[in-house]
């Protein structure tokens, strides 16, 4: 039986076009090998490119197409050209997350490639075995709270607000992911409950939700500043699922991203529901930014291609194909086909071509 999956592609700015081209190349390789699978790619604008063309960072047609799609693939947004004015590329990203209800951001941090252990800033004996996923609440908290800009009085403020249902929702996401493993993965919850009222509600709600709804699971609470130290000193201690608020998740996942040695390796998924049936709606993007200073052909496409692997497994119910993509990436990197960030000499397209060819070998 033939199946067609609609994927909205939002290249965004600078390297975004290059990396999404390589990611769709890999999906096309899957379709070539599996004639019953078809992908309908719909390209739209977001970020600075959208501002230049339409005056807004997220055109209505891009948002509406995304709402109707099976999944969304995003490149990267932003750059110095658009500065910090009233209309900014990043506003498009915040809006699409909110409008699509993408409340959970998943950022894996692991060493799938032992051949890259020497790339980590940590000694191999500390980096080896690191395997956790940050589950970041994405559409609430201080980034979406009430704020006051400086109106000339020299005073500004931002506010963080969380409700019990919002914390329950992200806790259930982490629990769902933990239960997909046998034995279930441990859960860490990061907060600042010794200082912040919002964190005290967070900790209480996480604890009660796990206890009442998922009694077979365990959760351990850690203060965010302590967790940041653990991440450098002994990152494997956090193995499992790491659940935290929007701002804390933003910071801790960026810190975690340097452990594997390059941002060009790290994928992410933003989901609107738990992937219990591998059909959760989601937006997929690399963890790195738009890299406006990087020459053409130098960006590493692996993070975006691994984001596609997550898409296949979590949103498109194509787990076998997703695993094939992961195996293909591992083979290509182990064979030394790498971009400059991994001390290689290959171009963006050469890495993408090699992965697309390798995918066919594993299907």
From Swiss-Prot:
Its cofactor is Mg(2+); Mn(2+). Pathway: Amino-acid biosynthesis; L-leucine biosynthesis; L-leucine from 3-methyl-2-oxobutanoate: step 3/4. InterPro entries: IsoCit/isopropylmalate_DH_CS, IsoPropMal-DH-like_dom, Isopropylmalate_DH. GO terms for biological process: L-leucine biosynthetic process. Disulfide bonds: none annotated. Keywords: Amino-acid biosynthesis, Branched-chain amino acid biosynthesis, Cytoplasm, Leucine biosynthesis, Magnesium, Manganese, Metal-binding, NAD, Oxidoreductase. The keyword Oxidoreductase applies. Binds 1 Mg(2+) or Mn(2+) ion per subunit. The record marks 143, 192 as: Important for catalysis. Substrate binds at residues 97, 107, 136, 225. GO terms for cellular component: cytosol. It catalyses: (2R,3S)-3-isopropylmalate + NAD(+) = 4-methyl-2-oxopentanoate + CO2 + NADH. NAD(+) binds at residues 79-90, 289-300. SUPFAM superfamilies: Isocitrate/Isopropylmalate dehydrogenase-like. Mg(2+) binds at residues 225, 250, 254. It comes from the Eukaryota. GO terms for molecular function: 3-isopropylmalate dehydrogenase activity; magnesium ion binding; NAD binding. Pfam families: Iso_dh. Its EC number is 1.1.1.85. It is found in: Cytoplasm. Belongs to the isocitrate and isopropylmalate dehydrogenases family. Catalyzes the oxidation of 3-carboxy-2-hydroxy-4-methylpentanoate (3-isopropylmalate) to 3-carboxy-4-methyl-2-oxopentanoate. The product decarboxylates to 4-methyl-2 oxopentanoate. Homodimer. This is 3-isopropylmalate dehydrogenase. The lineage of its organism: Eukaryota, Fungi, Dikarya, Ascomycota, Saccharomycotina.
